[in-house]
Amino acid sequence: MKVVEVKHPLVRHKIGLMREADISTKRFRELAAEVGSLLTYEATADLETETVTIEGWNGPVQVEQIKGKKVTVVPILRAGLGMMDGVLEHIPSARISVVGIYRDEETLEPVPYFEKLCSQVDERIALVVDPMLATGGSMISTIDLLKQRGCKQIKALVLVAAPEGLAALEKAHPDIELYTASIDRCLNENGYILPGLGDAGDKIFGTK
């Protein structure tokens, strides 16, 4: 599995701001989208382009445009919605596919409860977004579903990843790519990432 920890100064600065204990919902939400945007920039660097001729201001001109496969953004509910706008900033025509999964707080296992994938999802590059890769269960379950539906090119974008989650994801799906702003130290006994960001879903939506 290709793992890219994006170490751009802006990414490191913004993810550092997100770790503040008393950060406001508004600020956390803004930063989640901003870091999601920067991760998207890195994750799409290998998209193929083709030369096409368009009508410019002074006659025909050759330009490069994205060729071939289109993109679907796959936010894992609910926290993944906080990164979606950052992805769409760069790919506004992307289709949106939604997967609902929550983590059982006792077993730490993923529990699927909703899915709505876009048409022709099997012909698209899937960008799966979720702020936290802790145990990896939700991401693995989502990618399982996408592969069952025929997706062949899948990239995961997460704000923060734990080594345990990375190991589990690599074992389950060694053929995908993952982009993260930070690989953190470890999981605690409750399955939360240390130092982490806290509960990203609660911070994005202002709930507890």
Curated annotation (Swiss-Prot):
The pathway it acts in is: Pyrimidine metabolism; UMP biosynthesis via salvage pathway; UMP from uracil: step 1/1
Q: What is this protein called?
A: Uracil phosphoribosyltransferase
- What's the Enzyme Commission number for this chain? 2.4.2.9
Q: Which cysteines are joined by disulfide bonds?
A: none
Which ranges does the record mark as transmembrane?
Answer: none
- CDD domains per record: PRTases_typeI
Annotated GO biological processes are:
UMP salvage; uracil salvage
Q: Name one GO molecular function term.
A: GTP binding
- List the InterPro entries: PRibTrfase_dom (IPR000836), PRTase-like (IPR029057), Upp_B (IPR034332), UPRTase/APRTase (IPR050054), Ura_phspho_trans (IPR005765)
Q: What taxonomic ancestry is recorded?
A: Bacteria, Pseudomonadati, Pseudomonadota, Gammaproteobacteria, Alteromonadales
Tell me the residue numbers annotated for binding uracil: I193, G198, D199, A200
Describe the family membership recorded for this protein in Swiss-Prot or TrEMBL. Answer: Belongs to the UPRTase family.
Tell me which cofactor or cofactors this protein depends on: Mg(2+)
